[in-house]
Amino acid sequence: MAMEIDSRPGGLPGSSCNLGAAREHMQAVTRNYITHPRVTYRTVCSVNGPLVVLDRVKFAQYAEIVHFTLPDGTQRSGQVLEVAGTKAIVQVFEGTSGIDARKTTCEFTGDILRTPVSEDMLGRVFNGSGKPIDKGPVVMAEDFLDINGQPINPHSRIYPEEMIQTGISPIDVMNSIARGQKIPIFSAAGLPHNEIAAQICRQAGLVKKSKAVLDYHDDNFAIVFAAMGVNMETARFFKSDFEQNGTMGNVCLFLNLANDPTIERIITPRLALTTAEFLAYQCEKHVLVILTDMSSYAEALREVSAAREEVPGRRGFPGYMYTDLATIYERAGRVEGRGGSITQIPILTMPNDDITHPIPDLTGFITEGQIYVDRQLHNRQIYPPINVLPSLSRLMKSAIGEGMTRKDHGDVSNQLYACYAIGKDVQAMKAVVGEEALTSEDLLYLEFLQKFEKNFINQGPYENRSVFESLDLGWKLLRIFPKEMLKRIPQAVIDEFYSREGALQDLAPDTAL
């Protein structure tokens, strides 16, 4: 295995060409490759899964990008994961199939992985490595940004306080999402999480009042969609949905499909978030980032960890998966002095519907709540099958209430939660003792349970309910109970909203959207 030195012009005076090139190269390396020439290595000593081990390399740096040239002339890129003496371990993003240890050459670039970003990326489709796959031209970059992002000063972050209206009642009333929040959808195989995400994309916007002075126009709204390991059907579903609704011009898609290299999935969400950060903090757009499927990402992480022979953690996943997931999820929010925001909705499929699996478990620690998609509700033909009991939005308290939605919002949400939880208990009791043994109060809770699932949770995929309509629907269900049983709502709020006429009069000035 010979090491070739690229002998371009530029040797030092008074020395042979090769020696001058070698000295020039050494200076270039210590100056981060500002000048040429560079060394071309042909020292691949082993290939293990997605990893390539290089021997006899000099000045290799952690996270440095390496370009491989295969015997047939095709180019691939990789990233240095580990350097030990003269050896370097490189993960190849496009996969290692076809790499010949004797004939493959590689070149160290001296730079980290940067992606070209531009406002023109909206309306475009890229593969998992950021290359255009929509037959369009290469992106004319406004800037080249590090895909790992820049650290944000925690003191300069703004607390998310503007509620996003999704038009989906169980989310808007009971798990309100704030602009700048990170909230995942916990789903499982065969459940309609893609349809829910597409509906949120179609309908998401600020809660609008009839006589607003502020600009709520949708021109500054953008969607960045990253797919990891999804099948062609899912990718086509989202693409056609964006096109049919006329929003494709505000969407940037990164697609790593199931037949694409597994290792590419590690950089796909980072490319998407780097693009989102540029759109949010430089172009001042409000960006909604959808990442699906984070389970595929975690499995790609496990594959690299296994190839490096690291000590595995729970179920074979690496011990640093929590940290790695945090580097993705924490890139959401708002920054002082910037008009844009990044709201993240990662989608993950729980293996075997197990919420204690390491992927949903660690995701729930990092993110600000979760939306739980339930298989039992789906089997009963309820769409969206969102189970509100295990669902949670930790930033809901600051995004609702008088001045943002309506002053009864928090109380209605608490009472609906309480009644639904008691209704579930009564339903379980009924299965044991029978309906005849239930009290009149228990029967009221059963009636509430059925109507809540049928009328409140259930709605059409193109049905867009305002938060005020959803709150009115909640009051309509709560009127099943006498006032004395609504213990979670203050008496003043009950007096104002419990009677049908009072609720309608209060609602009249606010509902025109």
Swiss-Prot record:
Keyword Nucleotide-binding: yes
Motif mapping: PDZ-binding: 510-513
UniProt cross-references to PROSITE patterns, sorted A to Z: ATPASE_ALPHA_BETA
GO biological process assignments: adult behavior; ATP metabolic process; calcium ion homeostasis; chloride ion homeostasis; inner ear morphogenesis; olfactory behavior; ossification; pH reduction
Binding residues annotated for ATP, in chain numbering: 394
Tissue expression notes: Kidney; localizes to early distal nephron, encompassing thick ascending limbs and distal convoluted tubules (at protein level). Expressed in the cochlea and endolymphatic sac.
Effect of substituting residue 174 to R: In DRTA2; disruption of V-ATPase assembly resulting in loss of enzyme activity; impaired trafficking of V-ATPase to apical cell membrane; impaired renal proton secretion
Subcellular location: Apical cell membrane; Basolateral cell membrane
Gene Ontology cellular-component terms listed: apical plasma membrane; basolateral plasma membrane; cytoplasm; cytosol; extracellular exosome; extrinsic component of synaptic vesicle membrane; lateral plasma membrane; microvillus
Keyword tags: ATP-binding, Cell membrane, Deafness, Disease variant, Hydrogen ion transport, Ion transport, Membrane, Nucleotide-binding, Transport
GO molecular function: ATP binding; protein-containing complex binding; proton transmembrane transporter activity; proton-transporting ATPase activity, rotational mechanism
Domain of life: Eukaryota
Related illness: Renal tubular acidosis, distal, 2, with progressive sensorineural hearing loss: An autosomal recessive disease characterized by the association of renal distal tubular acidosis with sensorineural hearing loss. Distal renal tubular acidosis is characterized by reduced ability to acidify urine, variable hyperchloremic hypokalemic metabolic acidosis, nephrocalcinosis, and nephrolithiasis. It is due to functional failure of alpha-intercalated cells of the cortical collecting duct of the distal nephron, where vectorial proton transport is required for urinary acidification.
Family statement drawn from the similarity comment of this UniProt entry: Belongs to the ATPase alpha/beta chains family.
Function: Non-catalytic subunit of the V1 complex of vacuolar(H+)-ATPase (V-ATPase), a multisubunit enzyme composed of a peripheral complex (V1) that hydrolyzes ATP and a membrane integral complex (V0) that translocates protons. V-ATPase is responsible for acidifying and maintaining the pH of intracellular compartments and in some cell types, is targeted to the plasma membrane, where it is responsible for acidifying the extracellular environment. Essential for the proper assembly and activity of V-ATPase.
Domain notes: The PDZ-binding motif mediates interactions with NHERF1 and SCL4A7.
Name of the protein: V-type proton ATPase subunit B, kidney isoform
Source organism: Homo sapiens
Higher taxonomy: Eukaryota, Metazoa, Chordata, Craniata, Vertebrata
The gene coding this protein: ATP6V1B1
